[in-house]
From Swiss-Prot:
Keywords: Cytoplasm, Glycosyltransferase, Purine salvage, Transferase. Its main location: cytoplasm. InterPro entries: Ade_phspho_trans, PRibTrfase_dom, PRTase-like, UPRTase/APRTase. Belongs to the purine/pyrimidine phosphoribosyltransferase family. GO terms for biological process: adenine salvage; AMP salvage; purine ribonucleoside salvage. Its EC number is 2.4.2.7. The lineage of its organism: Bacteria, Bacillati, Bacillota, Clostridia, Eubacteriales. Pathway: Purine metabolism; AMP biosynthesis via salvage pathway; AMP from adenine: step 1/1. The gene is apt. GO terms for cellular component: cytoplasm. It comes from Desulfitobacterium hafniense (strain DSM 10664 / DCB-2). Homodimer. The keyword Glycosyltransferase applies. This is Adenine phosphoribosyltransferase. CDD domains: PRTases_typeI. It is found in: Cytoplasm.
Length: 170
């Protein structure tokens, strides 16, 4: 399937010079959404993960159905203050400031193999922080899969040493 044709491109959003890749047009098409999830499932299956981790918020839209298809659990990675229990956190630098990601402290066990699934690989900052967060728990990152990769932002360089898969590349 030509997944690219299901991605709406919105120029100058959220600011001038940005070409936004809108996945909602793929999500609303049942056949395309299922085919995209199935393609990611086949790639993730190869890494034999124990769990799928998806960063907030669009990582939930792909990570949860991938976990379901594989018959394994899904663990959400959230922004600070969104999880009710004890958490493990990782702070990372943004272009102008910093951000933090959290996961429940008991969600991931040492030695588990974890696959990260998200909608977009841009600069790699969020995914790199997610990987560090997983590794803080004593687990291993088994691979990373994305619906879209913006290759010109070179996020893959930041993820050297990890298996990275992208369904659509711009």
């Amino acid at each position: 399937m030509d997944f690219d044709k299901y991605i709406r491109v919105i120029d100058d959003f959220p600011k001038p010079g940005i070409s936004f890749k809108d996945i909602t047009t793929l999500l609303k098409d049942g056949e395309a959404y299922r085919a995209a999830v199935d393609a990611i499932v086949e790639r993730v299956r190869e890494s034999q993960p124990d769990l799928i981790v998806g960063p907030e918020a669009r990582g939930f839209l792909l990570g949860a159905p991938v976990a379901y298809a594989l018959g394994i659990g899904f663990v959400p990675v959230r922004k600070p203050g969104k999880l009710p229990g004890k958490t493990v956190s990782e702070t990372y630098e943004l272009e102008y400031g910093s951000d933090t990601l959290e996961v429940h402290a008991d969600a991931i066990q040492p030695g588990q193999r974890i696959a990260i699934v998200d909608d977009l690989l841009a600069t790699g900052g969020t995914t790199s922080a997610t990987a560090r967060l997983i590794e803080k728990t004593g687990a291993q990152v088994a691979g990373m899969s994305f619906l879209i990769e913006l290759g010109f932002l070179e996020g893959r360089k930041r993820l050297e040493g990890y298996e990275v898969f992208s369904l659509i590349k711009y």
